[in-house]
Amino acid sequence: MLYHVFYCLSSIFTPFNIFQYITFRAGGAILTSLLICFVAGPCIIEKLENFKIKQIVRTDGPETHLSKNGTPTMGGLLILLSVVASTFLWARLDNRFILWLLTGTLWLGFLGFCDDYLKLKKRDSNGLSAKSKIFGQTVFAAVLAAYLNFFPSNPEFATLVNVPFLKGFFINFSFLYALFVIIVIVGSSNAVNLTDGLDGLAIGNITIVAFSLTLFAYFAGHFQIANYLKIINVSGAGEISIFLFAVVGSSLGFLWYNSHPAEIFMGDTGSLFLGGVLGMVSLFIKQELVLVLLGGVFVIEALSVLIQIFYYRRTGKKVFKMSPLHHHYEMLGLSEMKVTVRFWIAGVILAILSFASLKVR
């Protein structure tokens, strides 16, 4: 919004030219979202406590988690509010990627809100059924897939997927690309949701992935840089950096309250939309497989659940003491904070490897 207000006045007051620069507006976005979280955080935590919107902890989980029972949840509302407000202020609202990301934020955020609401209403740790959540995610992903098919940002690469570390090598999904889009969005949304089981674990890794994708988006949107790095140039993708920096600021602000011992949990209200928008960004900038590496912590967490379910149904035995994977390490005796920090470190290492893929080919 600020771009549309001030940049058009730059002919009258030259300093307003600064609003044309993505780097300036991205800086404004991260500071705004961070400030909103810091200021609104205590108020939202208090309101959630007053309305008794509190976490229902699974009784079959680690015993150390029983103390978390009663911690305010639905904190994803704080993240969503700060991301949307900051993006609305600093991004160009005529950019189609921004409009889609805001739509995805609200759609998946509402889906997560419904899940959290049902958990509170039933006083149970189970809200929406898995089928209902996947259906809601799939509907949105299918609409986006249709849009990307009929209005691709770069028709030449519309159904191609870049393979990291291999120069100029692409996989052509052809008519299966729509299915690929659905898998990316549904998969990333649920992977983050499954990772959100320890204080600060999911939001810390979201910060790492979102910050890294910010740079990838900026590179993809800059013709000279994209050409130098031999990645697909996507017109308008640089604006995505502003949205992602809003996510980074919100994540850091939320981590202030979500770090161990957590004062608030994001719930599905936060995790579903955060995972979903990361998947959307990877599709927009044509770095879908880089997200698999960059978000490797989320991928491994999701795979641990799938492996556990599949193996248990086939043999009646468990591969892990408990899934997702972070609970397995807790059951082995590692402290919650140690598991969280080690997963953060793994996230940083994966981010470094992801950036290495830009040059090591």
Curated annotation (Swiss-Prot):
The chain crosses the membrane at residues 26-46, 71-91, 97-117, 134-154, 168-188, 200-220, 236-256, 264-284, 290-310, 338-358. The keyword Signal does not apply. It is found in: Cell membrane. It is a multi-pass membrane protein. One of its GO terms (cellular component) is plasma membrane. It catalyses: UDP-N-acetyl-alpha-D-muramoyl-L-alanyl-gamma-D-glutamyl-meso-2,6-diaminopimeloyl-D-alanyl-D-alanine + di-trans,octa-cis-undecaprenyl phosphate = di-trans,octa-cis-undecaprenyl diphospho-N-acetyl-alpha-D-muramoyl-L-alanyl-D-glutamyl-meso-2,6-diaminopimeloyl-D-alanyl-D-alanine + UMP. Keywords: Cell cycle, Cell division, Cell membrane, Cell shape, Cell wall biogenesis/degradation, Magnesium, Membrane, Metal-binding, Peptidoglycan synthesis, Transferase, Transmembrane, Transmembrane helix. CDD domains: GT_MraY (cd06852). GO terms for molecular function: metal ion binding; phospho-N-acetylmuramoyl-pentapeptide-transferase activity; UDP-N-acetylmuramoyl-L-alanyl-D-glutamyl-meso-2,6-diaminopimelyl-D-alanyl-D-alanine:undecaprenyl-phosphate transferase activity. Pathway: Cell wall biogenesis; peptidoglycan biosynthesis. It is an enzyme of class 2 (transferase). Its cofactor is Mg(2+). The keyword Protein biosynthesis does not apply. One of its GO terms (biological process) is cell wall organization. It comes from the Bacteria. Its EC number is 2.7.8.13. Its main location: membrane. Catalyzes the initial step of the lipid cycle reactions in the biosynthesis of the cell wall peptidoglycan: transfers peptidoglycan precursor phospho-MurNAc-pentapeptide from UDP-MurNAc-pentapeptide onto the lipid carrier undecaprenyl phosphate, yielding undecaprenyl-pyrophosphoryl-MurNAc-pentapeptide, known as lipid I. HAMAP family: MraY. Belongs to the glycosyltransferase 4 family. MraY subfamily. This is Phospho-N-acetylmuramoyl-pentapeptide-transferase. It comes from Endomicrobium trichonymphae.
